[in-house]
Amino acid sequence: MFVFVGSTVSLTAIVAAPVLTWIWANHLEPNLLKLTRLDWRLPKKFAHLHGLRIVQISDLHLNQSTPDAFLKKISRKVSSLSPDMLVFTGDFICRAKVESSNKLKNFLCSLNAPLGCFACLGNHDYATYVSRDIHGKINTIPETSSRPLRRALTSVYQSLFSSSHNEFAEEFTPQDPNPHLLSILHNTPFQLLHNQSVTLSDVVNIVGLGDFFAKQFDPKKAFTNYNPTLPGIILSHNPDTIHYLKDYPGDVVFSGHSHGPQISLPWPKFANTITNKLSGLENPELARGLFSFPQEKRLLYVNRGLGGWKRIRFFSPPEICIMRCLYEP
């Protein structure tokens, strides 16, 4: 009698691999929480920021499926980092729906920082959900006929076979911030900066921009009260907006939106290029990580975010970022 051990092992591996991948991507990695540590090397004129610790979180997309245990994990981790300042770069909710106002409020109230908590809005945070429609144009997406599969296929086709351009549908008009979300934020430690800037004790400017997809991105208005003698931290949900800020001041831009993207292949290089294109960004090379723009003397950090419409993650775990400000004479 012959026992084909090798064949049996191979068959088992073939069956087990996709099952284990599915379990990992749906149930394990979405609940991991990775910390990214960055250093901002300060020029002499900004030496007064030495030692400042800024924590960024982004893209929570809180909905009924967001586990309470995961929210507590985020809160504990942020607290353990002892941030001087906390920034949230948009997409508090999912598809313009506040599904659990108490859960969101309690989570946000569990976060704090002595210099303040600041936020901008993302494309999910307006009165109507804004994304790419079935033609690849930026448009409002009705809940009753969102056609997610067709929109996804259009997005994939555009990403792989043509360039994704930030083109608005002809009928699209600027969207107002979600009123329910605004009422929640009003009762939390977070100060929403919607095309606004604040100056903290003659130390630093904080600028928050409206979302680009919502047609609320207005840097001219946002920088009106900017103090050019001080450093500036800019919150802008969509990293594509970095190129619209060339004529404006500011030293560090925090963004999110792309989620990494949520399914990412770090190798081989061509696979990473393809998955980055699936982020839907006009500039897919900005899908995640730290970028330097020497001409503007500016840094951009694109956060992978914490959640998503679907809690699926593969080689792109949820992220908290901490940036230390360091001056070395």
Swiss-Prot record:
Predominant location of this chain?
A: membrane
Bilayer-spanning residue ranges: 2-24
Pfam families in UniProt: Metallophos
Annotated keywords? Cell inner membrane, Cell membrane, Hydrolase, Manganese, Membrane, Metal-binding, Transmembrane, Transmembrane helix
Q: What is its EC number?
A: 3.6.1.-
The keyword Metal-binding is assigned to this record: yes
Q: How does it sit in the membrane?
A: Single-pass membrane protein
**UniProt pathway:** Glycolipid biosynthesis; lipid IV(A) biosynthesis
Instruction: Give the GO biological process terms.
Output: lipid A biosynthetic process
Protein name from the UniProt record? UDP-2,3-diacylglucosamine pyrophosphatase LpxG
